[in-house]
UniProtKB/Swiss-Prot annotation:
Activated by C-terminal proteolytic cleavage by signaling protease (probably palB/RIM13) at neutral to alkaline ambient pH. The gene is RIM101. This is pH-response transcription factor pacC/RIM101. Transcription factor that mediates regulation of both acid- and alkaline-expressed genes in response to ambient pH. At alkaline ambient pH, activates transcription of alkaline-expressed genes (including RIM101 itself) and represses transcription of acid-expressed genes. Its main location: cytoplasm. One of its GO terms (cellular component) is cytoplasm. It comes from Kluyveromyces lactis (strain ATCC 8585 / CBS 2359 / DSM 70799 / NBRC 1267 / NRRL Y-1140 / WM37).
Length: 517
Protein backbone atom coordinates (compact mmCIF):
# COMPACT_ATOMS: atom_id res chain seq x y z
CA UNK A 1 0.00 0.00 0.00
CA UNK A 2 1.37 3.39 -0.96
CA UNK A 3 1.70 6.09 1.70
CA UNK A 4 -0.89 8.30 -0.01
CA UNK A 5 -3.52 5.54 -0.10
CA UNK A 6 -2.87 4.61 3.48
CA UNK A 7 -3.26 8.23 4.55
CA UNK A 8 -6.57 8.61 2.67
CA UNK A 9 -7.97 5.38 4.19
CA UNK A 10 -6.94 6.22 7.75
CA UNK A 11 -8.05 9.87 7.71
CA UNK A 12 -11.53 9.06 9.06
CA UNK A 13 -10.58 6.98 12.11
CA UNK A 14 -7.12 8.11 13.13
CA UNK A 15 -5.36 11.37 13.70
CA UNK A 16 -3.89 12.71 10.51
CA UNK A 17 -1.23 14.68 12.34
CA UNK A 18 0.18 11.58 14.06
CA UNK A 19 0.37 9.75 10.71
CA UNK A 20 2.16 12.68 9.16
CA UNK A 21 4.76 12.73 11.92
CA UNK A 22 5.25 8.95 11.62
CA UNK A 23 5.64 9.14 7.87
CA UNK A 24 8.12 12.04 8.12
CA UNK A 25 10.23 10.13 10.60
CA UNK A 26 10.00 6.98 8.50
CA UNK A 27 11.16 8.59 5.24
CA UNK A 28 14.12 10.34 6.83
CA UNK A 29 15.46 7.23 8.60
CA UNK A 30 14.34 4.25 6.43
CA UNK A 31 14.28 3.26 2.83
CA UNK A 32 11.28 3.03 0.54
CA UNK A 33 10.89 -0.72 1.07
CA UNK A 34 9.97 -0.43 4.76
CA UNK A 35 7.47 2.45 4.44
CA UNK A 36 4.39 0.26 4.79
CA UNK A 37 5.57 -1.28 8.01
CA UNK A 38 6.47 2.08 9.58
CA UNK A 39 3.20 3.85 8.82
CA UNK A 40 0.93 1.05 9.97
CA UNK A 41 -0.86 2.12 13.14
CA UNK A 42 -1.01 -1.49 14.45
CA UNK A 43 2.55 -2.57 13.86
CA UNK A 44 5.29 -1.49 16.25
CA UNK A 45 7.99 0.91 15.01
CA UNK A 46 11.16 -0.87 13.91
CA UNK A 47 14.56 0.54 12.95
CA UNK A 48 16.17 -1.65 10.26
CA UNK A 49 19.77 -1.19 9.33
CA UNK A 50 20.47 1.32 6.53
CA UNK A 51 21.18 -0.05 3.07
CA UNK A 52 23.96 0.79 0.75
CA UNK A 53 21.64 2.34 -1.86
CA UNK A 54 21.07 5.54 0.08
CA UNK A 55 20.77 7.94 -2.85
CA UNK A 56 17.60 6.38 -4.28
CA UNK A 57 15.96 6.16 -0.88
CA UNK A 58 16.74 9.83 -0.18
CA UNK A 59 15.18 10.93 -3.48
CA UNK A 60 12.04 8.86 -2.89
CA UNK A 61 11.78 10.13 0.69
CA UNK A 62 12.07 13.74 -0.40
CA UNK A 63 9.44 13.27 -3.13
CA UNK A 64 6.98 11.57 -0.78
CA UNK A 65 7.62 14.18 1.89
CA UNK A 66 6.85 16.92 -0.62
CA UNK A 67 3.57 15.22 -1.56
CA UNK A 68 2.58 14.89 2.09
CA UNK A 69 3.40 18.54 2.70
CA UNK A 70 1.18 19.56 -0.20
CA UNK A 71 -1.68 17.40 1.12
CA UNK A 72 -1.32 18.87 4.61
CA UNK A 73 -1.16 22.52 3.66
CA UNK A 74 -2.58 22.62 0.13
CA UNK A 75 -0.78 22.77 -3.17
CA UNK A 76 -0.61 26.59 -3.32
CA UNK A 77 0.04 27.26 0.34
CA UNK A 78 3.13 29.34 1.03
CA UNK A 79 3.63 27.54 4.35
CA UNK A 80 4.58 24.18 2.89
CA UNK A 81 8.26 24.65 3.58
CA UNK A 82 7.53 25.98 7.02
CA UNK A 83 5.68 22.80 7.91
CA UNK A 84 8.59 20.65 6.79
CA UNK A 85 11.06 22.91 8.61
CA UNK A 86 9.14 22.48 11.86
CA UNK A 87 9.67 18.74 11.89
CA UNK A 88 11.74 17.11 14.65
CA UNK A 89 14.65 16.78 12.24
CA UNK A 90 14.97 20.57 11.95
CA UNK A 91 15.45 21.28 15.68
CA UNK A 92 18.86 22.77 14.96
CA UNK A 93 17.18 25.79 13.35
CA UNK A 94 15.41 26.64 16.62
CA UNK A 95 18.69 27.06 18.49
CA UNK A 96 18.89 30.81 17.93
CA UNK A 97 15.60 31.37 19.70
CA UNK A 98 16.46 29.34 22.78
CA UNK A 99 20.18 30.10 23.04
CA UNK A 100 21.93 33.45 22.63
CA UNK A 101 23.39 33.99 19.21
CA UNK A 102 26.87 35.14 18.40
CA UNK A 103 25.61 38.67 17.66
CA UNK A 104 24.23 38.98 21.21
CA UNK A 105 27.54 37.87 22.65
CA UNK A 106 29.41 40.45 20.58
CA UNK A 107 27.39 43.33 22.06
CA UNK A 108 29.02 42.80 25.49
CA UNK A 109 32.46 44.36 25.07
CA UNK A 110 35.01 42.74 27.38
CA UNK A 111 38.17 44.51 28.46
CA UNK A 112 41.12 42.13 28.57
CA UNK A 113 44.07 42.69 30.87
CA UNK A 114 47.27 42.65 28.81
CA UNK A 115 49.65 42.72 31.74
CA UNK A 116 52.50 40.23 31.53
CA UNK A 117 51.23 36.80 32.59
CA UNK A 118 47.58 37.93 33.01
CA UNK A 119 44.63 37.37 30.69
CA UNK A 120 41.61 38.25 32.83
CA UNK A 121 38.61 39.98 31.23
CA UNK A 122 36.36 42.61 32.78
CA UNK A 123 33.04 44.08 31.77
CA UNK A 124 33.96 47.72 32.50
CA UNK A 125 37.15 49.77 32.29
CA UNK A 126 36.72 50.80 35.93
CA UNK A 127 37.08 47.21 37.09
CA UNK A 128 40.11 46.71 34.86
CA UNK A 129 41.80 49.83 36.20
CA UNK A 130 41.09 48.79 39.79
CA UNK A 131 42.55 45.35 39.02
CA UNK A 132 45.73 46.90 37.62
CA UNK A 133 46.24 49.24 40.57
CA UNK A 134 45.56 46.67 43.27
CA UNK A 135 46.90 43.42 41.83
CA UNK A 136 49.72 44.42 39.49
CA UNK A 137 50.98 47.79 40.76
CA UNK A 138 50.46 46.99 44.43
CA UNK A 139 51.55 49.13 47.39
CA UNK A 140 54.72 49.83 49.24
CA UNK A 141 53.10 48.95 52.55
CA UNK A 142 52.29 45.50 51.19
CA UNK A 143 55.82 45.10 49.77
CA UNK A 144 54.55 44.38 46.26
CA UNK A 145 54.98 47.80 44.63
CA UNK A 146 55.70 47.59 40.89
CA UNK A 147 56.76 50.87 39.24
CA UNK A 148 57.54 49.49 35.77
CA UNK A 149 54.71 49.12 33.27
CA UNK A 150 54.37 45.60 31.88
CA UNK A 151 51.33 46.19 29.67
CA UNK A 152 52.02 44.45 26.39
CA UNK A 153 55.15 45.87 24.82
CA UNK A 154 55.17 49.01 27.00
CA UNK A 155 58.41 49.51 28.92
CA UNK A 156 57.66 52.74 30.79
CA UNK A 157 59.50 53.16 34.08
CA UNK A 158 58.35 55.46 36.87
CA UNK A 159 59.62 56.44 40.32
CA UNK A 160 56.35 56.93 42.24
CA UNK A 161 53.11 55.02 42.54
CA UNK A 162 50.89 57.90 41.44
CA UNK A 163 53.00 58.17 38.28
CA UNK A 164 52.41 54.56 37.28
CA UNK A 165 48.71 54.72 38.16
CA UNK A 166 48.40 57.87 36.05
CA UNK A 167 50.27 56.17 33.21
CA UNK A 168 47.89 53.19 33.23
CA UNK A 169 45.07 55.47 32.06
CA UNK A 170 46.80 55.55 28.68
CA UNK A 171 46.20 51.82 28.21
CA UNK A 172 42.74 51.68 29.80
CA UNK A 173 39.78 53.37 28.11
CA UNK A 174 38.79 55.11 31.32
CA UNK A 175 37.60 58.74 31.44
CA UNK A 176 35.91 59.24 34.80
CA UNK A 177 36.22 63.04 34.98
CA UNK A 178 33.38 64.67 33.04
CA UNK A 179 32.70 68.37 32.53
CA UNK A 180 29.29 69.39 33.84
CA UNK A 181 28.95 72.12 31.22
CA UNK A 182 29.67 70.29 27.95
CA UNK A 183 29.77 66.62 29.14
CA UNK A 184 33.27 66.13 27.73
CA UNK A 185 35.22 63.41 29.56
CA UNK A 186 38.86 63.32 30.58
CA UNK A 187 41.26 60.78 32.01
CA UNK A 188 42.92 62.97 34.65
CA UNK A 189 41.70 65.79 36.90
CA UNK A 190 44.53 67.97 35.60
CA UNK A 191 43.12 67.71 32.08
CA UNK A 192 39.67 68.71 33.31
CA UNK A 193 41.10 71.73 35.12
CA UNK A 194 42.76 72.90 31.91
CA UNK A 195 39.48 72.46 30.06
CA UNK A 196 37.54 74.46 32.67
CA UNK A 197 39.53 77.58 31.81
CA UNK A 198 37.74 77.71 28.46
CA UNK A 199 34.33 77.93 30.14
CA UNK A 200 35.74 80.40 32.64
CA UNK A 201 36.75 82.80 29.88
CA UNK A 202 33.36 82.44 28.19
CA UNK A 203 31.53 83.17 31.44
CA UNK A 204 33.74 86.17 32.20
CA UNK A 205 33.08 87.68 28.78
CA UNK A 206 29.36 87.08 29.20
CA UNK A 207 29.35 88.93 32.51
CA UNK A 208 31.18 91.87 30.98
CA UNK A 209 28.63 92.15 28.16
CA UNK A 210 25.57 91.94 30.39
CA UNK A 211 26.77 94.37 33.02
CA UNK A 212 25.75 94.73 36.67
CA UNK A 213 22.24 93.32 36.74
CA UNK A 214 21.77 93.27 40.54
CA UNK A 215 22.12 97.08 40.67
CA UNK A 216 19.63 97.49 37.80
CA UNK A 217 17.09 95.28 39.54
CA UNK A 218 17.20 97.34 42.74
CA UNK A 219 16.84 100.58 40.82
CA UNK A 220 20.36 101.82 41.57
CA UNK A 221 21.57 102.42 38.05
CA UNK A 222 24.94 104.06 37.99
CA UNK A 223 25.63 106.73 35.39
CA UNK A 224 29.35 106.05 35.43
CA UNK A 225 29.70 103.07 33.09
CA UNK A 226 33.43 102.80 33.53
CA UNK A 227 32.97 102.26 37.25
CA UNK A 228 30.43 99.50 36.65
CA UNK A 229 32.77 97.88 34.14
CA UNK A 230 35.63 98.08 36.64
CA UNK A 231 33.45 96.38 39.23
CA UNK A 232 33.13 93.25 37.11
CA UNK A 233 36.66 93.19 35.75
CA UNK A 234 38.11 93.55 39.25
CA UNK A 235 35.75 91.66 41.58
CA UNK A 236 35.58 92.59 45.21
CA UNK A 237 35.63 89.01 46.55
CA UNK A 238 37.73 85.97 45.70
CA UNK A 239 36.61 82.36 45.59
CA UNK A 240 38.66 81.53 48.68
CA UNK A 241 37.04 84.34 50.65
CA UNK A 242 33.58 83.35 49.44
CA UNK A 243 34.12 79.77 50.62
CA UNK A 244 35.45 80.95 53.99
CA UNK A 245 32.58 83.36 54.66
CA UNK A 246 29.50 82.22 52.76
CA UNK A 247 29.68 78.42 52.60
CA UNK A 248 29.55 78.09 56.37
CA UNK A 249 26.55 80.40 56.74
CA UNK A 250 24.53 79.84 53.56
CA UNK A 251 22.25 76.90 52.82
CA UNK A 252 22.85 74.98 49.56
CA UNK A 253 19.60 76.36 48.13
CA UNK A 254 19.32 78.87 45.31
CA UNK A 255 18.18 82.35 46.32
CA UNK A 256 18.38 85.83 44.87
CA UNK A 257 20.87 86.98 47.51
CA UNK A 258 23.20 84.06 46.83
CA UNK A 259 23.03 84.69 43.08
CA UNK A 260 23.93 88.36 43.51
CA UNK A 261 26.88 87.46 45.72
CA UNK A 262 28.19 84.90 43.27
CA UNK A 263 27.90 87.43 40.44
CA UNK A 264 30.87 89.35 41.88
CA UNK A 265 33.00 86.33 42.82
CA UNK A 266 36.36 85.91 41.12
CA UNK A 267 36.34 82.49 39.49
CA UNK A 268 39.31 80.56 38.16
CA UNK A 269 42.41 82.42 36.99
CA UNK A 270 42.16 83.08 33.27
CA UNK A 271 45.92 83.05 32.62
CA UNK A 272 47.88 79.84 33.00
CA UNK A 273 50.68 81.54 34.91
CA UNK A 274 49.47 83.30 37.99
CA UNK A 275 52.83 84.90 38.69
CA UNK A 276 52.49 87.28 35.73
CA UNK A 277 48.95 88.37 36.58
CA UNK A 278 48.57 91.13 39.22
CA UNK A 279 46.92 89.88 42.40
CA UNK A 280 43.66 91.43 43.47
CA UNK A 281 43.28 93.46 46.63
CA UNK A 282 41.28 90.78 48.41
CA UNK A 283 43.80 88.03 47.66
CA UNK A 284 46.69 90.27 48.64
CA UNK A 285 45.06 91.12 51.96
CA UNK A 286 44.21 87.51 52.68
CA UNK A 287 47.75 86.26 51.93
CA UNK A 288 49.62 89.10 53.59
CA UNK A 289 51.93 87.62 56.26
CA UNK A 290 54.54 89.26 58.39
CA UNK A 291 58.06 88.64 57.04
CA UNK A 292 59.34 87.86 60.52
CA UNK A 293 56.68 85.20 60.92
CA UNK A 294 57.67 83.57 57.66
CA UNK A 295 61.37 83.66 58.39
CA UNK A 296 61.24 82.45 62.01
CA UNK A 297 58.22 80.18 62.22
CA UNK A 298 57.56 78.80 58.74
CA UNK A 299 59.67 77.11 56.11
CA UNK A 300 58.06 76.88 52.69
CA UNK A 301 60.04 74.32 50.65
CA UNK A 302 58.08 74.84 47.41
CA UNK A 303 58.09 78.56 46.71
CA UNK A 304 57.42 78.13 42.99
CA UNK A 305 54.43 75.88 43.53
CA UNK A 306 51.10 77.38 42.47
CA UNK A 307 49.00 78.40 45.42
CA UNK A 308 45.56 76.77 45.33
CA UNK A 309 42.50 78.99 45.33
CA UNK A 310 40.83 77.15 48.20
CA UNK A 311 41.86 75.45 51.41
CA UNK A 312 42.66 71.84 52.16
CA UNK A 313 41.18 68.95 54.06
CA UNK A 314 37.78 69.26 55.69
CA UNK A 315 37.20 72.77 54.35
CA UNK A 316 37.70 71.63 50.77
CA UNK A 317 35.40 68.63 51.24
CA UNK A 318 32.75 70.89 52.78
CA UNK A 319 32.99 73.27 49.81
CA UNK A 320 32.65 70.38 47.34
CA UNK A 321 29.56 69.13 49.18
CA UNK A 322 28.03 72.63 49.27
CA UNK A 323 28.38 73.29 45.55
CA UNK A 324 27.32 69.75 44.68
CA UNK A 325 24.08 70.09 46.68
CA UNK A 326 23.51 73.57 45.26
CA UNK A 327 23.95 72.24 41.72
CA UNK A 328 21.45 69.45 42.39
CA UNK A 329 18.93 71.94 43.81
CA UNK A 330 19.28 74.25 40.81
CA UNK A 331 19.01 71.33 38.37
CA UNK A 332 15.73 70.29 40.02
CA UNK A 333 14.41 73.85 39.74
CA UNK A 334 15.51 73.98 36.10
CA UNK A 335 13.83 70.64 35.32
CA UNK A 336 10.58 71.66 37.04
CA UNK A 337 10.77 75.19 35.57
CA UNK A 338 10.29 76.53 39.11
CA UNK A 339 12.52 79.53 39.63
CA UNK A 340 12.39 81.09 43.12
CA UNK A 341 11.34 84.69 43.26
CA UNK A 342 13.37 87.48 44.74
CA UNK A 343 13.20 87.62 48.53
CA UNK A 344 14.17 91.25 48.92
CA UNK A 345 10.90 92.56 50.34
CA UNK A 346 8.08 94.40 48.57
CA UNK A 347 9.28 96.56 45.74
CA UNK A 348 7.99 100.13 45.95
CA UNK A 349 5.43 100.60 43.21
CA UNK A 350 5.18 104.25 42.14
CA UNK A 351 1.69 105.68 42.56
CA UNK A 352 -0.06 106.78 39.39
CA UNK A 353 0.14 110.49 38.80
CA UNK A 354 -3.12 112.29 39.50
CA UNK A 355 -3.98 114.84 36.89
CA UNK A 356 -5.99 117.91 38.07
CA UNK A 357 -9.34 118.57 36.56
CA UNK A 358 -8.53 122.22 35.95
CA UNK A 359 -5.29 124.07 35.23
CA UNK A 360 -3.39 125.21 38.31
CA UNK A 361 -4.04 128.85 37.60
CA UNK A 362 -5.24 130.66 40.70
CA UNK A 363 -7.59 133.57 40.41
CA UNK A 364 -6.39 137.11 40.69
CA UNK A 365 -8.29 137.62 43.93
CA UNK A 366 -6.65 134.53 45.49
CA UNK A 367 -3.10 135.90 45.33
CA UNK A 368 -1.44 136.59 48.67
CA UNK A 369 -1.95 140.11 49.95
CA UNK A 370 1.50 141.64 50.08
CA UNK A 371 1.45 145.32 50.73
CA UNK A 372 -1.40 147.24 49.23
CA UNK A 373 -4.20 145.22 47.62
CA UNK A 374 -4.08 145.29 43.83
CA UNK A 375 -6.82 147.16 42.06
CA UNK A 376 -9.66 145.04 40.75
CA UNK A 377 -10.28 145.66 37.09
CA UNK A 378 -13.84 145.85 35.88
CA UNK A 379 -13.16 143.80 32.80
CA UNK A 380 -12.70 140.63 34.91
CA UNK A 381 -15.80 141.25 36.96
CA UNK A 382 -18.28 142.31 34.35
CA UNK A 383 -20.26 139.05 34.76
CA UNK A 384 -20.15 139.18 38.54
CA UNK A 385 -23.19 140.23 40.49
CA UNK A 386 -21.50 140.32 43.89
CA UNK A 387 -17.94 141.16 44.91
CA UNK A 388 -16.66 138.63 47.41
CA UNK A 389 -13.47 138.68 49.37
CA UNK A 390 -11.03 135.76 49.11
CA UNK A 391 -11.45 133.22 51.87
CA UNK A 392 -10.57 129.62 52.62
CA UNK A 393 -13.72 128.45 50.87
CA UNK A 394 -13.00 130.23 47.61
CA UNK A 395 -12.54 128.59 44.25
CA UNK A 396 -8.76 128.39 44.74
CA UNK A 397 -9.28 125.67 47.41
CA UNK A 398 -12.47 124.09 46.04
CA UNK A 399 -12.27 123.89 42.26
CA UNK A 400 -15.68 122.27 41.94
CA UNK A 401 -17.31 125.41 43.33
CA UNK A 402 -17.62 127.86 40.48
CA UNK A 403 -17.18 131.23 42.07
CA UNK A 404 -17.90 134.53 40.44
CA UNK A 405 -14.23 135.45 40.83
CA UNK A 406 -13.24 133.38 37.70
CA UNK A 407 -12.72 135.14 34.45
CA UNK A 408 -14.14 134.12 31.10
CA UNK A 409 -11.01 132.18 30.09
CA UNK A 410 -10.96 130.27 33.40
CA UNK A 411 -14.61 129.29 33.06
CA UNK A 412 -13.95 128.04 29.51
CA UNK A 413 -11.07 125.91 30.83
CA UNK A 414 -13.36 124.46 33.49
CA UNK A 415 -15.92 123.41 30.90
CA UNK A 416 -13.24 121.80 28.73
CA UNK A 417 -11.88 119.86 31.72
CA UNK A 418 -15.34 118.50 32.53
CA UNK A 419 -15.77 117.35 28.93
CA UNK A 420 -12.43 115.47 28.98
CA UNK A 421 -12.77 113.60 32.27
CA UNK A 422 -11.97 110.22 30.60
CA UNK A 423 -8.39 111.25 29.71
CA UNK A 424 -6.85 110.17 33.08
CA UNK A 425 -8.34 106.66 32.65
CA UNK A 426 -6.51 106.26 29.35
CA UNK A 427 -3.32 107.44 31.00
CA UNK A 428 -3.81 104.90 33.79
CA UNK A 429 -4.17 102.11 31.21
CA UNK A 430 -0.91 103.13 29.57
CA UNK A 431 0.78 103.15 32.96
CA UNK A 432 -0.46 99.64 33.69
CA UNK A 433 0.91 98.44 30.36
CA UNK A 434 4.29 99.97 31.13
CA UNK A 435 4.32 98.29 34.56
CA UNK A 436 3.48 94.96 32.91
CA UNK A 437 6.38 95.34 30.50
CA UNK A 438 8.66 96.16 33.41
CA UNK A 439 7.55 93.01 35.22
CA UNK A 440 8.24 90.92 32.11
CA UNK A 441 11.70 92.42 31.78
CA UNK A 442 12.41 91.68 35.45
CA UNK A 443 11.37 88.05 34.96
CA UNK A 444 13.74 87.77 32.00
CA UNK A 445 16.52 89.23 34.13
CA UNK A 446 15.78 86.70 36.89
CA UNK A 447 15.95 83.88 34.35
CA UNK A 448 19.24 85.11 32.92
CA UNK A 449 20.66 85.53 36.42
CA UNK A 450 19.62 81.96 37.26
CA UNK A 451 21.32 80.52 34.16
CA UNK A 452 24.45 82.54 34.82
CA UNK A 453 24.58 81.39 38.45
CA UNK A 454 23.94 77.78 37.41
CA UNK A 455 26.88 77.89 35.01
CA UNK A 456 29.07 79.40 37.71
CA UNK A 457 28.07 76.74 40.25
CA UNK A 458 28.85 73.90 37.84
CA UNK A 459 32.20 75.44 36.98
CA UNK A 460 33.22 75.89 40.62
CA UNK A 461 31.98 72.40 41.54
CA UNK A 462 34.12 70.75 38.86
CA UNK A 463 37.16 72.78 39.84
CA UNK A 464 36.83 71.98 43.55
CA UNK A 465 36.32 68.31 42.75
CA UNK A 466 39.55 68.28 40.74
CA UNK A 467 41.33 69.97 43.64
CA UNK A 468 40.01 67.31 46.01
CA UNK A 469 41.09 64.47 43.73
CA UNK A 470 44.59 65.92 43.42
CA UNK A 471 44.81 66.30 47.17
CA UNK A 472 43.77 62.67 47.64
CA UNK A 473 46.43 61.58 45.16
CA UNK A 474 49.05 63.59 47.04
CA UNK A 475 47.91 62.07 50.32
CA UNK A 476 48.21 58.57 48.89
CA UNK A 477 51.69 59.38 47.65
CA UNK A 478 52.77 60.65 51.07
CA UNK A 479 51.11 57.69 52.70
CA UNK A 480 53.18 55.33 50.57
CA UNK A 481 56.39 57.26 51.26
CA UNK A 482 55.87 57.35 55.03
CA UNK A 483 54.41 53.87 55.32
CA UNK A 484 51.13 54.88 56.98
CA UNK A 485 48.23 52.49 56.78
CA UNK A 486 45.36 54.85 57.58
CA UNK A 487 44.45 58.51 57.47
CA UNK A 488 44.04 58.66 61.28
CA UNK A 489 47.61 57.50 61.82
CA UNK A 490 48.84 60.10 59.36
CA UNK A 491 46.83 62.88 61.06
CA UNK A 492 48.00 61.88 64.55
CA UNK A 493 51.62 61.93 63.46
CA UNK A 494 51.21 65.35 61.87
CA UNK A 495 49.61 66.77 65.02
CA UNK A 496 52.42 65.35 67.14
CA UNK A 497 55.00 67.08 64.98
CA UNK A 498 53.14 70.40 65.11
CA UNK A 499 52.66 70.26 68.89
CA UNK A 500 56.30 69.30 69.42
CA UNK A 501 55.73 65.96 71.13
CA UNK A 502 58.11 64.12 68.79
CA UNK A 503 61.15 65.40 66.91
CA UNK A 504 60.40 66.63 63.42
CA UNK A 505 63.40 64.82 61.93
CA UNK A 506 61.63 61.47 62.31
CA UNK A 507 59.01 62.43 59.74
CA UNK A 508 59.32 64.81 56.80
CA UNK A 509 56.20 66.50 55.53
CA UNK A 510 57.25 67.94 52.19
CA UNK A 511 53.77 69.17 51.25
CA UNK A 512 53.05 70.91 54.56
CA UNK A 513 54.91 73.76 56.34
CA UNK A 514 57.24 72.64 59.10
CA UNK A 515 57.24 74.39 62.46
CA UNK A 516 60.73 75.26 63.61
CA UNK A 517 61.03 75.66 67.39
Amino acid sequence: MSPIAHLLNASTGTDSGSHLRDIHGHHDSHDHGSEEQAVSPLSPRSYPSPRSNSSSSCEESQSSAGVLANIHTGPASPHGKACVASSPLSTTGMRSASTPSSSDEDTVHLHRCQWKGCSLEFTSPELLYHHLCQDHVGRKSQKNLQLNCQWGDCQTKTVKRDHITSHLRVHVQLKPFACSTCNKKFKRPQDLKKHLKVHNEELSLLKKKRGPKPSNKLGKISNDRSRAHQRFTLPSISLDKFIHEEVKTQQPVYSQQLAEKMAIVLLLPVNNNNATSPPSASSASSTAVSPNLVSHHMVLPYQTQQRPLVGHGAELRSAVGFFNNLSMDMSRNYANNNLPTANLGPNPVPAPQSYPLIPKLPSISARPNVGAPPPVLSVFNRFDTHQTSPSSSSSAFYPQHYSNNYSLHQRTALLDAEANEDIPEKDNVSLEESFTSLNLSSEEQDLELFYETYSTVKLVKDYLLCELMEELDEFKEEEEEQGFTSFDEFSDSKECVIEGRIPSNKISLSKYPQVVI
